[in-house]
């Protein structure tokens, strides 16, 4: 059987959603104080782990994060992140970003083609894995700290573990 708790440790949350939750957590830059989640397997009879998950995270300074993830969607789509903030909203998907300020100002950008390298992967997977791996190797070769430290990586891993602890009701 593929997709087991023993071998993979989880499904959509640990494999796919972790990246978006990590990015949103980085934007929020605060300590999570409560996590509510619900995980289930709705569409994959050949795996036992989660293929659907949603949750709500509350942070110390008052920010909140809502997330929804699934890997039983009918087609492959880019990830979307939407931020609603005091002074406006931000939207990111694939290689596009847009900020709409409350005063009507709009900033938008599209990742330049020279910055996007997929290395034979599917384009909706994104391209940051390659950059992070290259930075890690460069940090080892040049005896410096990587852009993303182990300490930062541990923070998101602990948050993902808390999502699993609070959300595995359907798997008990």
Which residue stretches match the model-derived regions?
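Predominantly a Rossmann-like dinucleotide-binding segment in NAD(P)-dependent oxidoreductases
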Residues: 1-46
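Active-site rim elements
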Residues: 9-11, 120-124, 142-146
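A structural signal for well-ordered alpha-helical segments within the folded catalytic domains
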Residues: 18-22, 127-134, 151-158
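Internal, well-ordered alpha-helical segments in soluble enzyme and binding-protein domains
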Residues: 19-23, 31, 51, 79, ...
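Phosphate/oxyanion-binding loops and surfaces in catalytic or ligand/nucleic-acid-binding neighborhoods
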Residues: 27-31, 86-90, 163-170
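NAD(P)-dinucleotide binding in Rossmann-like oxidoreductases
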Residues: 45-50, 60-131
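Short beta-strand scaffold segments in enzyme catalytic cores
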Residues: 55-57
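C-terminal helix-rich "cap/oligomerization" subdomain common to oxidoreductases
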Residues: 60, 135-172
């Amino acid at each position: 059987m593929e997709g087991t708790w023993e071998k993979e440790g989880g499904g959509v949350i640990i494999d796919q959603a972790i990246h978006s939750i990590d990015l949103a957590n980085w934007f929020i830059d605060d300590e999570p104080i409560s996590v509510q989640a619900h995980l289930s397997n709705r569409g994959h009879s050949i795996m036992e782990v989660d293929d659907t998950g949603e949750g709500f995270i509350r942070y110390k300074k008052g920010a909140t994060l809502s997330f929804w993830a699934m890997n039983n969607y009918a087609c492959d789509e880019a990830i979307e992140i939407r931020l609603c903030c005091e002074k406006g909203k931000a939207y990111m998907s694939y290689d596009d970003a847009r900020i709409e300020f409350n005063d009507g100002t709009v900033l938008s950008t599209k990742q330049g083609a020279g910055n996007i390298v997929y290395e034979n992967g599917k384009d909706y997977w994104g391209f940051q894995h390659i950059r992070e791996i290259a930075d890690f190797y460069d940090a080892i070769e040049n005896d410096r700290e990587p852009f993303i430290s182990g300490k930062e990586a541990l923070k998101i891993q602990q948050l993902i573990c808390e999502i699993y602890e609070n959300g595995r009701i359907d798997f008990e």
